[in-house]
A protein has these predicted regions:
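Short, conserved SAM-binding/catalytic segment
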Residues: 1
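A conserved structural/catalytic subdomain of Rossmann-like adenosyl-cofactor enzymes
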Residues: 6, 11-241
Length: 241
């Protein structure tokens, strides 16, 4: 039977426990953020909860272990600590797949939040990242169109049957693209990778819903707040020195 523990994974850590498989959807937003965790295993100091959860998973995942993390868009493009954590992830792990989730995935709780699933295996550095776009020009998830398995049938075919897919077993398609590590490095390790043109932007009748616009604004504000928190932490450390 599974065990459920109520606590603070970032503050408490896992001691010596290590895991073969980790599936996690860390809490989004900046609520509860502000303090930089005092953990020796975190090589990058940040108050961003999502970035710290990535570092936490890197610690507790066994070498050869597999993980899938649901993370908001800003984790893919945030600068400073965000860039450093993404670099660490791709150095320590084979980040082989990113799934861009449909708009409205978290309906009715946080309809405007845009998110992704990052799939990786610990032990080998990233050579290439395959991205599946299940968002652009895809029916938005809402009460009339709830999220179900049909949204991901094509992704599952593209992903393949292996736990850790091999590039030679995959083929690019309209929604599935490969990006080399060098291409990503040239983007300053920005993983916000997309190539399809959003047809809704050409149609005045298909403008984003208010909750989507609010979600976009919240994401940008969270990025700005994270940057300010990092600056405040740096200034605080400077005073102590």
């Amino acid at each position: 039977e599974g065990e459920i523990h109520y606590g603070d994974s970032i503050a408490e850590g896992e001691g010596d426990k290590r895991y073969n498989v980790i599936l996690t959807n860390p809490p989004f937003g900046t609520k509860g953020a502000g303090d930089v965790p005092n953990r020796d295993d975190f090589t990058i100091a940040t108050s961003n909860k999502q970035l710290n959860f990535i570092q936490h998973v890197l610690t507790i995942l066994k070498t050869g272990g597999r993980a899938a993390m649901v993370l908001p868009d800003n984790v893919l493009f945030e600068e400073h600590a965000g860039r450093d954590v993404r670099g660490l992830l791709m150095h320590d792990c084979q980040l082989h797949t990113i799934l861009r989730l449909p708009v409205g995935t978290f309906t009715p709780y946080s309809a405007g939040v845009k998110a992704n699933v990052l799939f990786f295996r610990k032990g080998l550095p990233t050579q290439e990242v395959w991205v599946y776009d299940s968002r652009t020009n895809v029916q938005k998830v809402n009460k009339g169109h709830p999220l179900d398995a049909n949204y991901f049938q094509d992704f599952l075919k593209c992903f393949g049957a292996r736990h850790t897919p091999r590039s030679q077993d995959r083929q690019e398609s309209e929604r599935f693209r490969k990006f080399t590590r060098e291409q990503i490095r040239e983007r300053d390790d920005n993983l916000d990778l997309f190539w399809l043109k959003d047809e809704s932007l050409d149609d005045a009748n298909e403008l984003p819903e208010p909750e989507d616009l609010v979600g976009e604004a919240v994401t940008q504000l969270e990025v700005a707040l994270d940057a300010l928190n990092e600056l405040a932490a740096q200034l605080g450390n400077g005073k102590k020195g």
